[in-house]
Amino acid sequence: MSLVAEAFVSQIAAAEPWPENATLYQQLKGEQILLSDNAASLAVQAFLQMCNLPIKVVCRANAEYMSPSGKVPFIHVGNQVVSELGPIVQFVKAKGHSLSDGLDEVQKAEMKAYMELVNNMLLTAELYLQWCDEATVGEITHARYGSPYPWPLNHILAYQKQWEVKRKMKAIGWGNKTLDQVLEDVDQCCQALSQRLGTQPYFFNKQPTELDALVFGHLYTILTTQLTNDELSEKVKNYSNLLAFCRRIEQHYFEDHSKGSSSVRLS
């Protein structure tokens, strides 16, 4: 999209208030969605909750194929469809809602750097575990990913996705990593996040930003997703301030909000 087109879209978005029927789409929660997509969806839900913007979560078996980018989650707001956290943050900002406007330029650069760290380490580790760890692939991933579809389409789609992810892993230098090396990367990422958070309630003191939403989405999902073993979640559990951080956001933005609305609730 050209800069002129982007500016035009932003003007249109800004002119329309946030509707009550805004919808977020993801895969089927109980039997289909995988760790990485669940984390991405939860990050967007947390971000919108932090902005105090209502959103209804709708689960569709074909959500990945409905998305304009082929990735979930995506939101349908008025006549606009936007996918993934980064573009959604910009879309929401165009409507006058921002969590990071109070940061100075140095802080904004630091926030973006930590968001890159999460995407480069945690998200990539989740994808590796789902599609490159043979035990997880055999016991969880293929069955869940293909669950809405009849044989042989369920197997075809799962193998196609696995091939795509493995090709990506090779391209970024993760193709020959062992599971232990990936878990060490996760530990280093958690250590960096833990040190940055310190004793603060959020990464930039008292108010959450999109970084907090992103970190919460991934850490909470890692902590609450049953895998073939607990090695991944144990890495997060080593950092008590990250556990307290997840619980704080869960209580404030999901449990408290769910008392007045059934649209978002964590299991």
Swiss-Prot record:
Its main location: mitochondrion. The modification N-acetylserine is found at S2. GO terms for cellular component: SAM complex. GO terms for biological process: mitochondrial transport; protein transport. InterPro entries: Glutathione-S-Trfase_C_sf (IPR036282), Glutathione_S-Trfase (IPR040079), Metaxin_GST (IPR033468), Mito_Protein_Transport_Metaxin (IPR050931), Sam37/metaxin_N (IPR019564). Signal peptide: none annotated. It comes from the Eukaryota. The keyword NADP does not apply. It is found in: Mitochondrion outer membrane; Mitochondrion. Keywords: Acetylation, Membrane, Mitochondrion, Mitochondrion outer membrane, Protein transport, Transport. Interacts with MTX1/metaxin-1. Associates with the mitochondrial contact site and cristae organizing system (MICOS) complex, composed of at least MICOS10/MIC10, CHCHD3/MIC19, CHCHD6/MIC25, APOOL/MIC27, IMMT/MIC60, APOO/MIC23/MIC26 and QIL1/MIC13. This complex was also known under the names MINOS or MitOS complex. The MICOS complex associates with mitochondrial outer membrane proteins SAMM50, MTX1 and MTX2 (together described as components of the mitochondrial outer membrane sorting assembly machinery (SAM) complex) and DNAJC11, mitochondrial inner membrane protein TMEM11 and with HSPA9. Involved in transport of proteins into the mitochondrion. Belongs to the metaxin family. This is Metaxin-2. It comes from Sus scrofa (Pig). The lineage of its organism: Eukaryota, Metazoa, Chordata, Craniata, Vertebrata.
